[in-house]
Amino acid sequence: MLAPRGEARRKQLRTCALATGLGDKAVSLLYERVLRKERLELWIERCQAQISGVLDVLEKERAAVKTPYFFGERIGHADIAVACVLRFTGEAHAALFDAARYPALAAHSARCEALPPFAEIVQPLAPPSGD
C-alpha cells in the first residue's frame, strides 16, 4: 500500500505524515474544547490555524490529481489515512472541514467511504463529555 522505495515512497509518506499530523491537532483541539475547564484560547487558535493549513495543502494536492486516489488508480495507505482523518475532523470540528471549501478532499473522502471496508467498520464519533 506504499511504494517500496524512492521518491514515490517519500511522497506517499509525506501525505501520510500530513494526515496523521492533522489527526493529532484535531484530537488536541477536541481535548482542549471538551476536557479542559480553563480553555487556552491561544492554543485553540493555533490548533485551528494548523488544521486549516494542512487541509489547504491536502486540498491543493488532491485537486491536482486526476486519478481516483492520491497516487494512482488503486487505493493506498495515504488515501486511507486522509479519509480517516477527514471523517474524524469533520465530526469533531465540522466548522473546520467544510466541503465547499475543500471540494477535492470531500470527494476523496466520499469515494473512500463508499468502499465496503469503510462502510463495514465506520464508527461515528462519540467524544468524551468532559464530566
Each language-model region and where it sits:
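Carbohydrate-binding/catalytic loop surfaces
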Residues: 126-131
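Amphipathic alpha-helical packing segments from all-alpha helical-bundle domains
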Residues: 44-64
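GST-like domain detector, emphasizing the conserved glutathione-binding G-site
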Residues: 1-42
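Surface-exposed helix-capping loop/turn segments at secondary-structure junctions
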Residues: 60-71, 116-122
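GST superfamily/GST-like fold recognition
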Residues: 70-95
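C-terminal end-helix/capping segment
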Residues: 100-119
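All-alpha amphipathic helical-bundle segments outside canonical DNA-binding/catalytic cores
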Residues: 3-11, 66-78
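Residue-level preference for long, well-ordered alpha-helices that form the structural scaffold
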Residues: 40-43, 47, 101
